[in-house]
Structure formats: C-alpha cells, structure tokens
Amino acid sequence: MSDNTEYLTGLLSTHIKRTDLQVTKDQISQLVGFVQMIDKWNKTYNLTSVRDVESMLLKHIMDSIVVAQHLSQSHYIDVGTGPGLPGIPLAIMLPETHFTLLDSLGKRVRFMKQVAYELKLDNIQPVQSRVEDYVSPHQLNGVLSRAFASLNDMLNWCQHLIGNDGTFIALKGQLPQQEIDDLPAGFAVTEIVQLQVPELDGDRHLIKIVKS
C-alpha cells in the first residue's frame, strides 16, 4: 500500500459516519485498497476520468456503497461495469452476494481480476463480453446498471440475463421520468429510491424494475 493509506482511511471513515451504513474496518481497508489500485492503474490504462483519490472516494466508493442496503438478491450481474463500479465496492460490502462484472474491454477485465486477487475477493467474477452476447453459466437474479444506458435499452439488452422473478436495478442521476413513462411492455417499476451521498452534489436515484 502507498503512504496515503492512513489519510484515505480517515477520509473514507468520515464520509461513512455521515450515513447509516455499517462498514467494518476490514471493509474500509479493502475499499481504500481498491481506490489505490484504480489510481495506480489509471496512470497507464485510463480506467476512469476521475483523477484524484479524494474524488474517487466520493464518486466511485460512496456513490456505490449507498446502494448496498437496497440489494436483496443472491447473484447480480453488473453490466458495463468499467473498472468494477459499482460491483466491486458492493461485493466488499456484501460478501455473501455474488457479482458477475461484465465489460467489453480487456484492460478493465484484467484490472478487475487483479483486484480480486490482491483484495482476496472470492464473490466477483469479471467477464469480458458485450452484454447482448453474454449467456451466464449461473442463475442470475439481478441486473445492475450504472450510467450504462437508457432504461429502455437496458431492459432490451439485459432481459435475457435473468428469469421472471429477477430484478433490474438502474442507478441514475436525475430521475428520468420520460424513460419511466416509456418503459417497454412487460416491465414495471416497483420502487424508486432517492439516494443520499455525503459531500456529493446532484440527484441520485435507484430504480427497481421487474418483469410484469
């Protein structure tokens, strides 16, 4: 670990105290380690446009882990995950939940595999594939989408991934009311949650959708 570990640990702990999240010291250590790995790899592989570690803690870690308390399924697929967002922070928060992390770029998948190795995460499976081409060998019961596509596109591209009892979780900024109104036939919104992220301006919404 680099010499900013103590600084980042303190900063993340302060952010977490402003929420009702229950996060162990080991989990904080893993989350900080993840940020340090993004920062290190970003210099070569351009994994994210966020360049400073302080912003990464907010925009990548806090913005992801506030979702944890709203997930109840056993196996999620995070589509268009990039470097593992929100899937890896959520996997750290929910060690009993399995996450398939799907991205089409090999450099991102290689990074996520290294994260799994270094942080000893056995509940993530990074996969390189386009979402419309992917067929899971496992039973999936939840789809996660963060800044990935419109609701219509997400549902059209991902509906083959889960069964009729599965849940689609779309993470959005401003509430996309027009997208909700234009949902394709056969789908229904069951819950809309306004997420609170300390120190982060702008709206954050979680939208749960099921097959109807």
UniProtKB/Swiss-Prot annotation:
Gene name of this polypeptide: rsmG
Compartmental location: Cytoplasm
Originating species: Pseudoalteromonas atlantica (strain T6c / ATCC BAA-1087)
Superkingdom to which the source organism belongs: Bacteria
Top-level EC class as recorded in UniProt: transferase
EC number: 2.1.1.170
Positions of transmembrane segments: none
Statement: the UniProt record of this protein carries the keyword Transferase: yes
Function: Specifically methylates the N7 position of guanine in position 527 of 16S rRNA.
Reactions accelerated catalytically: guanosine(527) in 16S rRNA + S-adenosyl-L-methionine = N(7)-methylguanosine(527) in 16S rRNA + S-adenosyl-L-homocysteine
UniProt record similarity statement: Belongs to the methyltransferase superfamily. RNA methyltransferase RsmG family.
Family matches, as InterPro entries: rRNA_ssu_MeTfrase_G (IPR003682), SAM-dependent_MTases_sf (IPR029063)
Entry keyword S-adenosyl-L-methionine: yes
Listed GO MF terms: rRNA (guanine-N7-)-methyltransferase activity
Name the record gives this protein: Ribosomal RNA small subunit methyltransferase G
Annotated binding of S-adenosyl-L-methionine, by residue: 80, 85, 131-132, 146
Record keywords: Cytoplasm, Methyltransferase, rRNA processing, S-adenosyl-L-methionine, Transferase
Signal sequence annotation: none
GO cellular component, one term: cytosol
